[in-house]
Amino acid sequence: MNFTPIFAGTKTCYMPNSVSLHRVLKASPEKVYRAFTDKSAIASWLPPWGFLCTVHEMDVKVGGGYRMSFQNFSTGSSHSFGGKYVELKPNELLRYTDKFEDPNLPGEMMTTVELRKVMVGTEIKIVQENIPDVIPAEMCYLGWQESLEKLMKLVEPNIPDA
């Protein structure tokens, strides 16, 4: 079982099979929320470095579902996953399930994304829980760090139309 530190104020808690991330982005909550709910946007930033993403289905509403695949650009191998949107508050909160199609990666994860407007942009907090035992939580954490770096590069520039 993996234990990942969860930071609550100045206290560090350890939760099995979970990761917790926190960032501040120089972009509005509306723009960050759109990056999570637009097919083309999420395909550009969610996969970690070296992976491509295909979004097969994305119905962003409570009870709606999504399905996507990540393909390793080096080897060509891919894995597919999907889930359901459990809770949505535009520009504030997304909570959704994640389930791999591979039977060797059992269980259902829960991902919670909280957005809060701050003076310089948006504070984003992400918690992913119930990561399958066969996936090191550190690997998920590293993947999320890479994804959030790509998200930042998508949402922070303010490029006017020509």
Language model features by range: what are they?
Residues 154-162:
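Short, highly charged C-terminal tails/helix-capping segments
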Residues 23, 55-58, 81-86, 109-116:
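Hydrophobic/aromatic beta-strand elements that line small-molecule binding cavities or substrate pockets
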Residues 29-30, 58-62, 86-93, 114-123:
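A short, structured loop/turn motif at beta-sheet edges
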